[in-house]
UniProtKB/Swiss-Prot annotation:
Organism: Xenopus tropicalis (Western clawed frog)
Known catalytic reactions: N-terminal L-alanyl-L-prolyl-L-lysyl-[protein] + 3 S-adenosyl-L-methionine = N-terminal N,N,N-trimethyl-L-alanyl-L-prolyl-L-lysyl-[protein] + 3 S-adenosyl-L-homocysteine + 3 H(+); N-terminal L-seryl-L-prolyl-L-lysyl-[protein] + 3 S-adenosyl-L-methionine = N-terminal N,N,N-trimethyl-L-seryl-L-prolyl-L-lysyl-[protein] + 3 S-adenosyl-L-homocysteine + 3 H(+); N-terminal L-prolyl-L-prolyl-L-lysyl-[protein] + 2 S-adenosyl-L-methionine = N-terminal N,N-dimethyl-L-prolyl-L-prolyl-L-lysyl-[protein] + 2 S-adenosyl-L-homocysteine + 2 H(+)
Protein name (database record): N-terminal Xaa-Pro-Lys N-methyltransferase 1
Entry EC number(s): 2.1.1.244
Coiled coil feature spans: none
Molecular function in Gene Ontology: histone methyltransferase activity; N-terminal protein N-methyltransferase activity; protein methyltransferase activity
InterPro entries referenced in this protein's UniProt entry, alphabetically: MeTrfase_NTM1, SAM-dependent_MTases_sf
GO BP: chromosome segregation; N-terminal peptidyl-glycine methylation; N-terminal peptidyl-proline dimethylation; N-terminal peptidyl-serine dimethylation; N-terminal peptidyl-serine trimethylation; spindle organization
Subcellular location: Nucleus
Signal peptide: none
Biological role: Distributive alpha-N-methyltransferase that methylates the N-terminus of target proteins containing the N-terminal motif [Ala/Gly/Pro/Ser]-Pro-Lys when the initiator Met is cleaved. Specifically catalyzes mono-, di- or tri-methylation of the exposed alpha-amino group of the Ala, Gly or Ser residue in the [Ala/Gly/Ser]-Pro-Lys motif and mono- or di-methylation of Pro in the Pro-Pro-Lys motif. Required during mitosis for normal bipolar spindle formation and chromosome segregation via its action on target proteins.
Keyword S-adenosyl-L-methionine attributed: yes
Any single Pfam family the record assigns to this protein: Methyltransf_PK
Annotated keywords: Methyltransferase, Nucleus, S-adenosyl-L-methionine, Transferase
């Protein structure tokens, strides 16, 4: 379990919060200096998501409302979710990022319903509200127990045929703690195990292509 890497839970969360307080409210800041990969990332995400939005028949995922978790300034909200959904809610632990989002999103930001300033370990989506809950590059800031609990709460937040998507760095063997931003990069088998513990079933798993060789492999997991 990766939580064994967390010696002091309160410190784990506090250190991460302090780290993000000092990160510039820019796309490059959101991506740790890798702003140049944003388009590749968003194109891969759109392709992954549209397989569910374009499904034929009764299993098709709706396009009414999405939730962006760990939303930052709204990079994903602006370029992925607002073009595909009628409304979007954003949740992030850093108030300065959400404040910046209101100008960064421009006119389309009028379709953002709520800006929730909250850590995901304390956040509960409104039941039966969202067609898609998008969780990208943020699960490393949750302990295993809090991640499982959060996914359970997300499951309750889904509308019929809704899906949860996790997109994040994974390792192939052991989980690794990053002491700089106080986050855990989990091994892919552990991510699958925690999803199962939350009572969710995987619908699709896909590796993001065309990312720089020096960064961790990034996988998308769709579930409900």
């Amino acid at each position: 379990m990766s939580t064994e890497l967390v010696e002091d839970e309160a410190q784990f969360y506090c250190k991460a919060q302090k780290y993000w307080k000092n990160v510039p409210a820019t796309v490059d800041g959101m991506l740790g200096g890798y702003g140049h990969i944003s388009n590749i990332d968003l194109n891969g995400s759109k392709k992954f998501l549209q397989r569910f939005l374009r499904q034929e028949g009764s299993n098709k995922t709706g396009n009414m409302y999405a939730l962006d978790c760990g939303a930052g300034i709204g990079r994903i909200t602006k370029r992925l979710l607002l073009p595909l959904f009628k409304k979007v809610d954003m949740v992030d632990v850093t108030d300065e990022f959400l404040s910046k989002a209101k100008s960064y999103l421009g006119e389309e930001g009028s379709r953002v319903g709520n800006y929730f300033c909250c850590g995901l370990q304390e956040f509960s989506p409104e039941p039966n509200r969202y067609d898609v809950i998008w969780i990208q590059w943020v699960i490393g800031h949750l302990t295993d127990e809090h991640l499982v609990d959060f996914l359970k709460r997300c499951s309750l937040g889904l509308r019929p045929n809704g899906i949860i998507v996790i997109k994040d760095n994974v390792t192939q063997d052991v989980s690794i703690m990053d002491d700089v931003d106080s986050s855990i990069c989990r091994d892919i088998d552990l991510v699958r195990k925690l999803i199962k513990q939350a009572g969710l079933s995987l619908l699709a798993v896909e590796r993001q292509e065309n990312f720089p060789d020096e960064i961790y492999h990034v996988f998308s997991f769709a579930m409900r």
